[in-house]
């Protein structure tokens, strides 16, 4: 449950999972940058950045959209998945990574935010099942929103409301 995930994210010894989280950061940000610099899809990320260049919220969307467009348009760069999906892995991690960097958070805070986001995504997926009409990227987006609430020092009640209302 969310309480256990919150407790784990706060107490896990990061050294045991640092290598995995570094791979997630490096792979998923690399494809996001490729999506912004290359010609993939219709260029949603680039268009958003032109319309709203100074917004942190826009930047979260821009990088996630650019990564997804690159992946879905055949970019061969690897990504770190979540629950077996590349788009879920990117939506789970990229907003958290960009948010932490934009806010000047520590490396440890970033890692704990990623732990929280990844586990919330997995937790939500357990209630959906293997086959569903529900797109798992929505769970991942919800999880990254909850992780941002977590990174802002949100209480369990606030985090639960983020999950419920996303």
Task: Tell me what each language-model feature is.
Residues 22, 54, 58, 89-93, ...:
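Conserved structured core elements
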